[in-house]
Amino acid sequence: MYSLSRILQRSQRYNFAPSSFGAVSKLEVSSGGDKERVFKSFGLIYSKPQGLVRLYSARDVFSRFFGIHKLSSIADAKDKGDEVVREEELSESEEAVPVSGDVPEGVVDDDSLFEPELGSDNDDLEIEEKHSKDGGKPTKKRGQSELYESIVAYKSVKHVLEKWVKEGKDLSQAEVTLAIHNLRKRKSYAMCLQLWEWLGANTQFEFTEANYASQLDLVAKVHSLQKAEIFLKDIPESSRGEVVYRTLLANCVLKHHVNKAEDIFNKMKELKFPTSVFACNQLLLLYSMHDRKKISDVLLLMERENIKPSRATYHFLINSKGLAGDITGMEKIVETIKEEGIELDPELQSILAKYYIRAGLKERAQDLMKEIEGKGLQQTPWVCRSLLPLYADIGDSDNVRRLSRFVDQNPRYDNCISAIKAWGKLKEVEEAEAVFERLVEKYKIFPMMPYFALMEIYTENKMLAKGRDLVKRMGNAGIAIGPSTWHALVKLYIKAGEVGKAELILNRATKDNKMRPMFTTYMAILEEYAKRGDVHNTEKVFMKMKRASYAAQLMQYETVLLAYINAKTPAYGMIERMKADNVFPNKSLAAKLAQVNPFKKCPVSVLLDI
């Protein structure tokens, strides 16, 4: 019988390091139809009259096994800073970089939240067909969808659907679901939403709860959480089930809305929905970024309600232990996984190898990498995507080259992406470009991920000109320019030391554009201004985030306070601002508040204060 207490038991303190999982959401649907001074402190154990309340003190139960380390995360108009860039300062060539496109891209984040739990493909645009004859890993084939192919070719959902109906073609649940699935894999969220909206307005298509959940997820991604909440009320009561609510919960995590996520979780309890491991995993992810003290409460809740950890839960725990450098604790979790009968697949093995490398245990990592390769690449070609970055991490260019040659002979989309990234880690830009070009030649319907993989290499090597040229190439190739592309450009300019131009590009992109930038895009600019002690611009970006409906959280306020600290400027009214935003400081934030307290007295001033 599994026990979360046993999983986390150890003599030392348990340090929950940040999870490697991004704050993102991925809809879980069936394939059949597919975060010492505080103002206030909450825990998570649920009770009906009070909702989420703390029932255990820091010394109760789980404190025997681990300690909890919380997350560390009106401008003066005269303080303009050095990074205010006038629009005319940009050259014509810079203005030529596309910042918008004809086809909306939607809010693009890493769509892989607890992916092993929700299902992940071993190749792009593939679906599971059947198990191999020897009873091994299921074989895959490319998901053929005429509707999807037509939409991508015409880049017009309305045109294709009108023609589709006129010709009397099938708009079955299976065809629509597969088209939505493939469009999601391309991050074409706006197109997915248009498809659902058109079906709802122009046909008698019978929507299932999973269909409504998919549409709600897309409304939140393309528009906002507020609009998603409005859409929720429009869903027929019979289809307003647990799947729909947990989809909204996942998007609250994506948007970093802690209070709203807790409200949704409580609402699901009030509606007497069973507490799912998916919902608990979402809260674990949320609190890993915003309030680590509550992580123990989630784990206690799972134990109290007999919710068995999923593979994704174990992934989270392994990442927490690994990032904290607790290799012994990580290995104890692995033992528990084995006791539970969960197979250590290549994905889990690659995560373990990654943390062995970080801990300097190169030989252990290499042993695991040999296990991952197993009987040979011909039998398990998909393991290249895990092995390539690992060999790059230990600087083994020979094995990276060996695997890259195999990838060339047996081109798979995911393996090619990993090869590009591996060569980037080794600073072999030309090799990465060569893999990219071969991928361009192979795929006619070319997703954005390879462009972003190559853009990341240009960013890390401060190759501004090449990065800009790549974005132009994306535009010329008909690739949708949207939030994810803006994010790549912003990172490129920030890394090159041009944060002012990065902000200007973002301002241009969002002008007259309904799509909003990603949370991480704003944070990249906010953090750079804060590092420079540019209070004015830091506050300006902070307000932009609020206007873009990104709720003020601990990490934003901590970054703003860092700007005041670096500028050696007192911050007036900061505590009141935080109270107004319902943000309560943890230990790290409280320390920063003390540093910028305008009424703080030094020891000498106290002596002379008579």
Curated annotation (Swiss-Prot):
Keywords: Mitochondrion, Repeat, Transit peptide. Residues 128-137 have a biased composition (Basic and acidic residues). Pfam families: PPR (PF01535), PPR_3 (PF13812). Gene3D superfamilies: Tetratricopeptide repeat domain. Signal peptide: none annotated. GO terms for cellular component: mitochondrion. InterPro entries: Pentatricopeptide_rpt, TPR-like_helical_dom_sf. PPR repeats lie at residues 241-275, 276-309, 310-344, 345-379, 380-410, 412-442, 447-481, 482-517, 518-552. Residues 107-127 have a biased composition (Acidic residues). It is found in: Mitochondrion. The keyword Cytoplasm does not apply. One of its GO terms (molecular function) is mRNA binding. Residues 88-142 are annotated as: Disordered. Residues 1-71 form a transit peptide. Its main location: mitochondrion. This is Pentatricopeptide repeat-containing protein At3g15590, mitochondrial. It comes from Arabidopsis thaliana.
